[in-house]
Each structure stands twice: as C-alpha cells, then as structure tokens.
C-alpha cells in the first residue's frame, strides 16, 4: 500500500482482550499515531476496531494491536482495508 494514502481499517481482535486494558491501549496508540475512529468490546469476547488515517499509521496501529498491552493475549487480528470515508473525529472508546 502506498505510504501516506488515507485508508480505513476494520479489525476484529480475539483472545484475552477484554478486561485487560486493551481498548485504552488502542486509544492511546491511535491518538499518538494521529488516527481517527473507535474501539469497543463485543458481546462474543472480541474487540472491534474501526480506524482511518494514513496507511503507514494504520499499519503501525495494527502491529500494536497484534501485541496489545502486557496483560492481553491476542490470538487473531482479522483486518479489512478500504478507502477512507472521513467518518470520524478523534479516536474514542465506545461502550
């Protein structure tokens, strides 16, 4: 993917990713990378991430969520890429 191009990622993260600070970890990393969007816990125990920004920043964010905070145990990260829709302002944790 072309560096600097605005893209959107939709990701589903599974493993021990709830109750371990995963959403706040993701929010901090996204804000540091100047990525917009949101992250939330899902009822099936996974975490959902929707984010937009430069391709290189999103790639860095996806690398970070593969690791997660020390207390997390990430099993899978399923990612779908699409064109950015400029749909978000800032980055937040959804409840």
UniProtKB/Swiss-Prot annotation:
Superkingdom as given in the UniProt entry: Bacteria
Transmembrane segments: none
E.C. numbers: 3.6.1.7
Entry GO MF terms: acylphosphatase activity
Reactions listed under catalytic activity: an acyl phosphate + H2O = a carboxylate + phosphate + H(+)
Residues annotated as signal peptide: none
Protein name: Acylphosphatase
Domain Acylphosphatase-like: 8-95
